[in-house]
Amino acid sequence: LKKLHLYRDVQRTGKWCDLGQVRSAWNSTVLVLGLGDIGGEFAKRAKALGARVIGVRRTGTDKPDFVDELIHTDKLDEYLPQADCVAITLPGTTATKGMFDAERMAKMKDGAILLNVGRGMIVDTDALCAALENGKLAGAGVDVTDPEPLPADHPLWKMENAVITPHISGGYHLQETHDRICLLYTSPSPRDRTRSR
């Protein structure tokens, strides 16, 4: 949204350079696929930044307070053209494998941003590259890819409008996560093992 990755690239050249307009979460529409721990936390933050948040679930009808609207996955294609940002936080299953292929990306809003912190198998990486290259998508942020690890010569690495992290965006790199894991293994009491949040 703020082009920070591009400004980092320009910084290396030593140039003071304005890269033009940026986008804001305010008044945008964010579609969050999967409302588990990761999706729920992402949705809360998007809403706090002023976005209209649409949650997508396979099951369940109880709408959490942190989403403005809750839909089932069978209505996904109807809502894709509205979304400025699509955040995928789904697990990798036979039902989600290849869910975001070229056909589905074509249904997305022109200039949308695609985020994938779920599993790489959900997004067709070659279709993603094509959508980024032809301008269908304004950008992508992926913490997971297919294949994973992404080969060094894969074209996604060279996409200026993509940010790639090597499956590290989860909480496993936080000290508090390590502390909780240690507590699980060292505590004699099951009650102490859950005393982390």
Q: Language-model segments: which ranges?
A:
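Phosphate-binding beta-alpha-beta segment of Rossmann-like dinucleotide-binding domains, i.e.
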Residues: 1-29, 41
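Adenosine-phosphate binding glycine-rich loop
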Residues: 160-180
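Rossmann-like adenosine-cofactor binding region
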Residues: 60-155
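NAD(P)-binding Rossmann-fold cofactor-contacting core
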Residues: 49-65
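Glycine-rich Rossmann-fold phosphate-binding loop(s) that bind the pyrophosphate
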Residues: 35-36
